[in-house]
């Protein structure tokens, strides 16, 4: 089986995440997608609680699965002590699914920081790296390129960010065009991101 791993803080999950999951399913012919909620060692603090982020990731996988069961959410990274590192998640998933071909799905920003990741040179031995590149970044030097990490780039440009969504919610602005309906409802119902 081909298993995609898509990690992130999902604070909150948005339409860009949803589109990336669906796009990856078709383009990469994935059999399974694991959406892993993490603590990003390069970001300072989450804005929603771990429980809220896990709940919203489950809602994201429900949206992805509307066309058939494919995605599952994981809170394994949050359940471990200390910082969360991609290489540890990959080792864990490789132990769970030893016969699967693993594909790590990352966005442009994460890909650009890959050279700073713990055990970055080990990652290609555990999985194929697929990054979703944004227009305008193609000529930039990346840490991952400097390490000669083998990657597959997929052009994908969906200009929506969790930072902007949090800012809009805090300002009392609607975000219904930026997040799936179930996540929009969850944010409102739980009063997330209000200042």
Swiss-Prot record:
Tell me which EC number(s) this protein carries: 2.7.7.18
Known InterPro entries for this protein?
Cyt_trans-like, NadD/NMNAT, Rossmann-like_a/b/a_fold
| Entry keyword ATP-binding | yes
Single GO biological process annotation from the record: NAD biosynthetic process
Which GO MF terms does the UniProt record name?
ATP binding; nicotinate-nucleotide adenylyltransferase activity
Q: Please name the pathway.
A: Cofactor biosynthesis; NAD(+) biosynthesis; deamido-NAD(+) from nicotinate D-ribonucleotide: step 1/1
Keywords in alphabetical order, please: ATP-binding, NAD, Nucleotide-binding, Nucleotidyltransferase, Pyridine nucleotide biosynthesis, Transferase
Question: Is Kinase one of the keywords UniProt gives this record?
Answer: no
Q: Which reaction does it catalyse?
A: nicotinate beta-D-ribonucleotide + ATP + H(+) = deamido-NAD(+) + diphosphate
Q: Which Pfam families match?
A: CTP_transf_like
Q: Which CDD domains match?
A: NMNAT
Which family is this sequence assigned to?
Answer: Belongs to the NadD family.
Q: What is the role of the protein in this entry?
A: Catalyzes the reversible adenylation of nicotinate mononucleotide (NaMN) to nicotinic acid adenine dinucleotide (NaAD).
Q: What is this protein called?
A: Probable nicotinate-nucleotide adenylyltransferase
